[in-house]
Structure formats: C-alpha cells, structure tokens
Regions:
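Core catalytic alpha/beta fold that binds nucleotide/phospho-ligands
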Residues: 1-123
C-alpha cells in the first residue's frame, strides 16, 4: 500500500544561482559528503545538483514531515551505484520504521531547464 508520494520540480538555473551565491555552504547544508563528491565529479554539475535537491524535496513530501521534528537534509542520501536509490538515516530512518515502511522508490529526471524528483513510499 502506498503511504506517501512526493514530487518536486526545480529550475536548474535557480539551484545554480544559489550555489554561486552560497558556494560550499549550500552544498554542505543539503548534501552528504558522498552526494557532494558525486555531484562535483560530474561534467553536468548544476544538473546533478538540481536533481538531487528535487528528489530530496520529494522524499520529504512523501514522508509528510517537511524539514521539522528533527528531520534534516542529511537524513536522506541519494546513492548513485546503479539506478539511483535513497538511503535513510537519523529521524527519517526512525519514521520509516514507525510507519512500517517496506519500500522507498525514487526517480530523477532532468532536461535543459528543469530537474524533477519523485518518491513513493510503500508500507
């Protein structure tokens, strides 16, 4: 049974502008070290950064928590070995156990101007 579905779309230019203004401070706020290393190694850095940002927003929406109650950007990590998937930790891991989560699926898509992230949580 589906517990939650979240979707988010972002302007790649907007994310690029935020990065140009705040630099590494922005990256450290929203990405884990592994995600940062992955994005920085890509030729299409802004595209990959925007995709990860969008899917993390989608995960937060699917859990219905927002960034509150102890949930942080670092409670989820987009893992890029094979098809992208999300690893949970901290408060989101606790919430997932509490709701009896059986599966979490994500998808990331991007094109020239936008990136979109989708998350479905099954219980």
């Amino acid at each position: 049974m589906i517990y939650g579905c979240g979707i988010d779309i972002v302007s790649i230019k907007r994310i690029e502008d935020i990065y140009e203004k705040h630099g590494e401070r922005f990256l450290r706020r929203v990405l884990t070290d592994l995600e940062m290393d992955y994005c920085m190694a890509q030729k299409a850095f802004p595209l990959n950064l925007a995709g990860r940002f969008a899917v993390k927003e989608a995960v937060i929406k699917a859990f219905k928590t927002g960034l509150s109650g102890g949930v942080t950007w670092h409670d989820m990590e987009v893992v890029s070995s094979g098809p992208p998937h999300v690893a949970l930790s901290g408060r989101l891991q606790e919430i997932s156990a509490g709701i009896g989560m059986k599966a979490i699926s994500i998808s990331i898509a991007h094109e020239k101007e936008h990136a979109v992230g989708l998350c479905i949580i099954e219980v």
